[in-house]
Amino acid sequence: MSQENTLNSGDETILAEAVAPAHAVFTLSVRPDNIGIITVDVVGDKVNTLKAKFAEQIAEILQQAQALSQLQGLVIISGKPDSFIAGADITMIAACHTAQDARILAQKGQSILAQIAAFPVPVVAAIHGACLGGGLELALACHSRICSQDDKTVLGLPEVQLGLLPGSGGTQRLPRLVGVSKALDMILTGRQVRARQALKMGLVDDVVPQDILLDVAIQRAKAGWLDKPALPWQERLLSGPLGKALLFNIVRKKTQAKTKGHYPAAERIIDVVRKGLDHGGPAGYEAEAKAFGELAMTPESAALRSLFFATTSLKKESGGKAQPRAIHRVGVLGGGLMGGGIANVTATRAGLPVRIKDINPTGINQALKYTWDTLGKRVRSKRMRPAERQRQMMLISGSTDYCGFGNVDIVVEAVFEDLSLKQQMVADIEHFAAPHTIFASNTSSLPISDIAAQAQRPEQVIGLHYFSPVDKMPLVEVIPHAKTSEETIATTVALARKQGKTAIVVADRAGFYVNRILAPYINEAARCLLDGEPIASVDKALVDFGFPVGPITLLDEVGIDVGTKIIPILVEKLGARFAAPPSFDVILKDGRKGRKNGRGFYLYPAKSSGFKWKRSPVKQVDTSVYTLLGVTPKAHLESAVIAQRCTMMMLNEAARCLDESIIRNPRDGDIGAVFGIGFPPFLGGPFRYMDSLGADKVVKTLNLLAQQYGERFEPCSLLVTMAGQQKRFYPPENSLDEAAITAHN
């Protein structure tokens, strides 16, 4: 690169400009008013990500800028329309073979950003779009930050979600900028904040419309060095010796309670932030780089990164061997909880007009109210303007007949689990909708081939299984039957992605994938209960293992009637190993459906209309369940044994699903279990976990359990074959370390 090194401030026609090669990511131009503009644009990529190979470019650009004697300020802005810098390219970690390699990688990032922080004239980050991870660390190194008031603009440090910590100074600069309590919250959760929230917490200095973002950033740079605003008194109090000791003690206890020790990055984040506050910046940066290097080599980080790469690769696949049809309008049959949720994500995330049909106007009103209420939360938190809520609400309409269905491209059916009713829905849509309209059933148990049995256009019938609550659960299963066309598959996957969902394509067999691996897990938990193990002990064992909730709690939340409805179908189609314990029927006969009717395995006190305590009462077991089941609760099994019994049933069934081509590959099986059930992410999913244990150990464990508890534990043929041939589900270079997760072995 070459650069004109002189500026004549009296002649505004002179402009210094870097002559950069076509592939340059960082380019510098200097305005007549002596403000330099550094534009970041990774050519060929949709978003900007930082790579190690860019370090020399950044250093050279900064050297060129510093050589301009009359330069008054710098503005860093993105050349992408909707993204600032989405983070660092985490594939760089794959090239690190030791903790020292990863440590050096972090130190290089720290060194480059230190040059920005020490730049002799003000450097301003003009932020529009995603400013995450390394992107936010770069912005933190700048002397000022201006961001756009736009829904696309979010700021965050999500490294903890990959089992890492911010490695380029984020753990040191953020606490000093916004205060230690706010910084710890952001770094430990990985949560993203929007523009107004970022301004309120002191993360950015101004929020402006996008069309004047650059102008305001330039004016900020011209203003010279400005005094840093004082932290709020609460944050100043927490930075003192007593406040700091109290805060870190509370944060550490809460973190340990939440992570159960399964996510080492959280503990290291607390240590590194504390190190910098207690011993100063140099010690903090050194601790940050060291911790980054060590965390990059942990099996937990490897597992979490594998999930990231898995979902990234899945998003690039259409699901079918054809191009999807364009989707302009969507229909939803049924305005209940599922139908209302599907309409919600279609309108608010996909931005598509959606027409709801329900036999009762009340159902339509409930569906509309659901979206109104969810958007209302965003309005109240200042994340959405009332006018935008109104605009999104106008995308949803309803009717008690098929008026308006003539021009929909896909209809999602969410009515009762009744085969004849669903077949009638297919016939109605084929009659009232357009010839190209796809019929997608949200069934959780009925075969799609049966639903399509009487269809005139069976190639346009498919399953689309959402999980409740629809707006929170990220997974959907796309279920083609034998006659479903590739175009229908691709179009359905495309709709799910527009709705913000992670979609896996699974075979049309009983239980599909998620419910099929969940059923034996729940059944085994029920057997532990019938063996006399207390309800709370069973749940705690699986929560300690890493699941977000225990299996008994999950059954209560889903609905005992719903959760057990699929069991007879699985028994009929797949055999007796799916049979629930016979005495478990008394739970349903007693009218217990779980939280939804206030009667389950736990007590659900009625909501009080009076004074609301800030802390909810601790959930209590309904001890009358023990009398109903005829058992005397007594904790006699170790937590590890309970967890082993339940999870081994799930692992065995997951392997069967792969062997029977229910799922297309181990990757989809891992994604389905993590996002559909809450399988511990730090284990990477059932197949990553089995690789870490080794097929031989899985088979040996299953055989021992079969000897002790019955033939339901007999290992499937695929696992036996893999154990004999010492095979893995993933290639060795993509597998977790052999010694990974020893606490779960």
Curated annotation (Swiss-Prot):
Entry's EC annotation: 4.2.1.17, 5.1.2.3, 1.1.1.35
Protein name: Fatty acid oxidation complex subunit alpha
PANTHER family the UniProt entry points to: TRIFUNCTIONAL ENZYME SUBUNIT ALPHA, TRIFUNCTIONAL ENZYME SUBUNIT ALPHA, MITOCHONDRIAL
Single GO MF annotation: NAD+ binding
Alphabetized HAMAP family for the sequence: FadJ (MF_01617)
Main location: cytoplasm
Keyword list, A-Z: Cytoplasm, Fatty acid metabolism, Isomerase, Lipid degradation, Lipid metabolism, Lyase, Multifunctional enzyme, NAD, Oxidoreductase
Ranges where the record places region 3-hydroxyacyl-CoA dehydrogenase: 325-745
InterPro entries xrefs: 3-OHacyl-CoA_DH_CS, 3-OHacyl-CoA_DH_NAD-bd, 3HC_DH_C, 6-PGluconate_DH-like_C_sf, ClpP/crotonase-like_dom_sf, Enoyl-CoA_hydra/iso, FA_oxidation_alpha_subunit, FadJ
